[in-house]
């Protein structure tokens, strides 16, 4: 059964979603087929619910994790909603700061300018964005505070630019606290 977070709701004290039954296939180009028209299903009737929700990390995102937290223990939610909610991707990386370039989180333009003076080549990222949206690279010759002002209503992440990013970044996979591997994103 496949649904989008926007299709998740509570009705008559039951967690429900409107979505589609689908069938998985071993075909690289067409790996699933919808097996139903859009229907409403009670998520507690499923043994597992797999949570994979892309940011932006906003109130819709948070609300869906709160709703999934209400499922009975008989329905296992893979990617615990509480853990997902409490582990925002960009801030979670500070648990591994020894692997990070110099990094700043702020909404203060003066502090960003000081960081740029020191690091000389920086990347700015909305803290709760995704998919590369709102990411900007600046050096001392092209810094434009007007671009950043659009994002400074919330703190942003600012990092020293590292050339190795051209080789891609890595997504690390853990299951129940155990490392299972990583995937290069290029």
Where do the protein language model's features map onto the residues?
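Conserved residues at the C-terminal ends of beta-strands
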Residues: 52, 106, 185
């Amino acid at each position: 059964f496949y649904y989008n977070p926007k299709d998740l709701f509570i009705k008559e004290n039951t967690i429900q979603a409107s979505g589609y039954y689908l069938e998985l296939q071993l075909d690289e180009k067409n790996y699933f087929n919808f097996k139903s028209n859009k229907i409403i299903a009670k998520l507690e009737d499923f043994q597992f619910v797999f949570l994979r929700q892309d940011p932006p990390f906003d109130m819709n995102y948070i609300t869906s994790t709160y709703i999934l937290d209400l499922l009975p223990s008989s329905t296992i939610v893979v990617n615990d909603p509480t853990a997902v909610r409490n582990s925002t991707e960009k801030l979670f990386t500070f648990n591994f700061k020894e692997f990070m370039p110099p990094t700043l989180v702020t909404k203060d333009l003066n502090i960003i300018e000081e960081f740029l003076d020191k690091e000389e080549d920086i990347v700015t990222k909305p803290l709760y964005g995704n998919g590369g949206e709102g990411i900007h690279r600046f050096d001392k010759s092209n810094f434009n505070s007007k671009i950043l002002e659009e994002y400074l209503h919330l703190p942003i992440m600012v990092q020293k630019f590292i050339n190795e990013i051209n080789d891609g970044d890595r997504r690390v996979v853990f299951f129940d606290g155990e490392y299972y591997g990583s995937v290069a994103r290029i």
